[in-house]
Amino acid sequence: MMPGSRLDTSVWRLSAAQALAGANTTVVYATGAIIGNVLAPRPAFATVPISVFVIGMASATLPVGALARHHGRHAAFLFGNLCGLIAGLVAALALFISSFWLFCLAMLFGGAYAAVVLTFRFAATECVSEDSRHRALSAVLAGGVAAGVFGPQLVTATMNLWSPHAYMVTYIAASGAAVLSAVVLLGVKFEHRPPVARSGGGRPMATILRQPRFIVAMLCGVVSYTMMNFMMTSAPLAMEFCGISRTDSNYGIELHVIAMYAPSFVTGRLISRFGALNVTLAGLVLIGFAAIVGIGGMTVGHFWGALVLLGAGWNFGFLGASAQVLACHSADEGPRVQAINDFVVFGAMVIGSFISGGLLSALGWSIVSGLILPPLLLAAVGVMWMKWSRQGSIVRALE
């Protein structure tokens, strides 16, 4: 087998694993708030399971980065898939005995699994040459298109298979998907992996974190992901409050997740052609349109339209921000910087997840939608400042 073929195979294995593992996140977001509303001791706690899921993502990010740095990506992948298996089985048990807090514990493991899955995008860049990094990153996230179909359809097909315990079979099936993902990942080869850095190698972390372009990249990642999560967490519960069927709600999440990942087939090329800043800005604008549609009404069409725009905006915003992060560090600094970036992103998401359920109950869907606009404006100002600063630097260099 030729080297190029092996590299392509590794990228597509990561993409297939993304499709299988992505079902974990899709199932959680499609069902977490609904299950929480049934099991929680009070309505304001309905979105706590999803908040705990995000806490799992945030708390696992730095340890996963350290595990990958010291023992290799495959060790991190194995840890993630083990967490996915545990999450599905514990969630099924929680539903069987109707335990809200045990379900929250399952979500903690599910979040840790999701944190590992998000490293697939950076892992793909170690399977290809430098000039193919953006395409590899996009190819892996494109596997989420399959997850966008697989996850919600899995929920719809299994949610009532054991009617006394809705969604129990769903989580058992999700644990099976984690096992299949582990098998697929066994064949991934990191042919362009940088040498392991010595302790203290690379620039001091403070130097990297002080870079204006890194600050803007992290801000855009935080806003894109947190605002998407804030709105998506509330959407299934808001649809239930509006009398929309769970089948239509699942389909809305399916459209959303497809919209999150389908643009990945071209996002890498768009970044190469127009630059990461422009693609990020386009994503922020699309998320803004999602908020406007959400404010505009609470019909099925409004929910679906807002979720599609929200997904596409996340893709451009988050992938553009990820590409900016890649430009802020050397190869041996990568795992540390990427782990810190993801830790900050997920940490911000925790806050959004915790407050979304209470805000939805107290203020309604329209207000929840409108609240995402100010952070989007702040991130857009940061992007425009970077664009103007870069243009000014070019002009000064030519003088």
Go through each PLM region and give its residues.
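C-terminal ends and interior cores of transmembrane alpha-helices
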Residues: L82-I97, L286-M298
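Juxtamembrane intracellular "pre-TM" segments in multi-pass secondary transporters
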Residues: M1-D8, F190-M218, E399
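Intracellular juxtamembrane helix-capping segments at the cytosolic ends
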Residues: G32, A114-V128, F316-S330
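C-terminal membrane-cytosol helix-exit motif in multi-pass small-molecule transporters
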Residues: V155-T156, S175-P195, G382-K387
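Hydrophobic core of transmembrane alpha-helices in multi-pass small-molecule transporters
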Residues: A19, F100-A115, H302-F316
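Helix-to-loop junctions at the C-terminal end of transmembrane segments
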Residues: A60-G72, M159, P263-A276, L360
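Cytoplasmic helix-loop-helix junction between adjacent transmembrane helices
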Residues: A106-G143
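Glycine-rich segments within core transmembrane alpha-helices of 12-TM secondary carriers
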Residues: R135-Q153, V344-G352
